């Protein structure tokens, strides 16, 4: 997690597997490819939070996801974020969400085992399913496609500012490398985690 000054405000940068919650005048930033970020906020308590995660298996090929490192996979990433929001004074009944990411970035890697996976689509499906189940409304979304995204979550009016990473080859390559390492770590965790636990299925 990285802090940066931006327009005389602190910008907190989060990476894969991380989350951040604040009731201060801080902007939360992340860089997304196939990963997804959920921006949660309670406008009454004036608390915001964001996570950044990627699921480790293709649900069309496997019957379950495995419970592994907390914060890395969907249900845990969401539960950790929601619980952190509640600890800061948010109330579940007032939570609203905005979702971003899920681009077809990892599958664009040449000679990549992920060419056969719809990682971005899987993450989008999961987030929608989870939020619907938890009755947390999705106010807006910017998802899918083939471009990476940089997003900034502004606590003053709960806006999320987004720019696409379209033609910046070095940034895309770096993003692919980071998410590929993240996916490999998730896969290693799956193989070493022992007894499988169903955490989401249609």
Curated annotation (Swiss-Prot):
It catalyses: L-glutaminyl-[protein] + H2O = L-glutamyl-[protein] + NH4(+). It holds the Pfam family CheD. Its EC number is 3.5.1.44. Keywords: Chemotaxis, Hydrolase. One of its GO terms (biological process) is chemotaxis. It is an enzyme of class 3 (hydrolase). GO terms for molecular function: protein-glutamine glutaminase activity. Gene3D superfamilies: 3.30.1330.200. The keyword Hydrolase applies. InterPro entries: CheD-like_sf, Chemorcpt_Glu_NH3ase_CheD, Cytotoxic_necrot_fac-like_cat. Belongs to the CheD family. PANTHER family: CHEMORECEPTOR GLUTAMINE DEAMIDASE CHED 1-RELATED (PTHR35147:SF3), CHEMORECEPTOR GLUTAMINE DEAMIDASE CHED-RELATED (PTHR35147). Probably deamidates glutamine residues to glutamate on methyl-accepting chemotaxis receptors (MCPs), playing an important role in chemotaxis. This is Probable chemoreceptor glutamine deamidase CheD 2. It comes from Shewanella oneidensis (strain ATCC 700550 / JCM 31522 / CIP 106686 / LMG 19005 / NCIMB 14063 / MR-1).
């Amino acid at each position: 997690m990285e802090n940066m000054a931006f327009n005389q405000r602190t910008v907190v940068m989060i990476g894969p597997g991380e989350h951040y919650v604040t009731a201060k005048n801080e902007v939360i930033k992340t860089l997304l490819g196939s990963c997804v970020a959920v921006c949660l906020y309670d406008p009454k308590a004036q608390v915001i939070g964001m996570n950044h995660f990627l699921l480790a298996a293709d649900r069309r090929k496997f019957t379950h996801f495995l419970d592994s490192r907390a914060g890395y996979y969907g249900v845990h990433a969401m539960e950790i974020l929601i619980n952190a929001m509640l600890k800061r004074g948010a109330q579940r009944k007032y939570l609203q969400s905005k979702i971003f990411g899920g681009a077809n970035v990892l599958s664009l890697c040449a000679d990549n085992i992920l060419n056969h996976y719809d990682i971005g689509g899987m993450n989008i499906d999961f987030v929608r399913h989870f939020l619907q189940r938890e009755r947390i409304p999705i106010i807006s979304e910017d998802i899918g496609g083939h471009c990476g995204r940089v997003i900034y979550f502004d606590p003053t009016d709960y806006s999320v500012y987004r720019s696409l990473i379209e033609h910046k080859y070095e940034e895309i390559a770096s993003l692919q490398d980071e998410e590929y390492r993240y996916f490999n770590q998730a896969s290693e965790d799956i193989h070493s985690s022992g007894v499988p636990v169903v955490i989401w299925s249609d």
